[in-house]
Amino acid sequence: MNTEAAGKRVHVIQGEFKVVNDPHIVLSTILGSCVAACLRDPVTGVGGMNHFLLPGSASSPSSGADATRYGVHLMELLINGLLKQGARRDRLEAKIFGGARTIARFSNVGEQNAAFARRFLMDEGIRIVGESTGGDHGRKLEYWPSSGRARQYALTGVEAQRAMQMDQRPAAPKPVESSIEFF
């Protein structure tokens, strides 16, 4: 039986990351100028995806900027999440998606996002085994972390408008400071 075809879908929205070790899970997202980095350890089958809006980081922690919008924060969270689930850094491999130029009159933040992801992964010694970035259309992405398989669909018309609106909406809400997470 093809476990990928019958997989449980987990959506990753802007400002989030997910780490899984279940071969029946497919991670999915919709990207415009945002970038999703998909990382996995092929030996353990642990993998994950993030979805970030901007490269770099907030200028200062006290500025009130939401760190989950930034690639540097979400890349660190994804890598640390993989390591906590048993992945080894020296075996990690990556695929990068997104970074489209969805609005021609604005600066090309999509290109900056893709360049940031490439540079970050290279600096961390993580091998990039696949990439589909740039262009002027959004993408719908599906990623099977256990196998490393990825599939994307170009978004046009109404779908592209929806992706652009998602890029411009607020990131996932921050957890309440007094909340407790149980493992």
Swiss-Prot record:
Enzyme class: hydrolase
InterPro entries in the record: CheD-like_sf, Chemorcpt_Glu_NH3ase_CheD, Cytotoxic_necrot_fac-like_cat
GO BP annotations listed: chemotaxis
Keyword NAD part of the UniProt annotation: no
Enzyme Commission number(s) of this protein: 3.5.1.44
Catalysed transformations (reactions): L-glutaminyl-[protein] + H2O = L-glutamyl-[protein] + NH4(+)
Bilayer-crossing regions: none
Pfam families from the UniProt entry: CheD
CDD domains: CheD (cd16352)
Keywords from the named record: Chemotaxis, Hydrolase
Keyword Hydrolase tagged: yes
Molecular function terms, GO-annotated: protein-glutamine glutaminase activity
Family designation: Belongs to the CheD family.
Job description of the protein: Probably deamidates glutamine residues to glutamate on methyl-accepting chemotaxis receptors (MCPs), playing an important role in chemotaxis.
Protein name per its UniProtKB record: Probable chemoreceptor glutamine deamidase CheD
Organism: Sinorhizobium medicae (strain WSM419)
Lineage, uppermost ranks: Bacteria, Pseudomonadati, Pseudomonadota, Alphaproteobacteria, Hyphomicrobiales
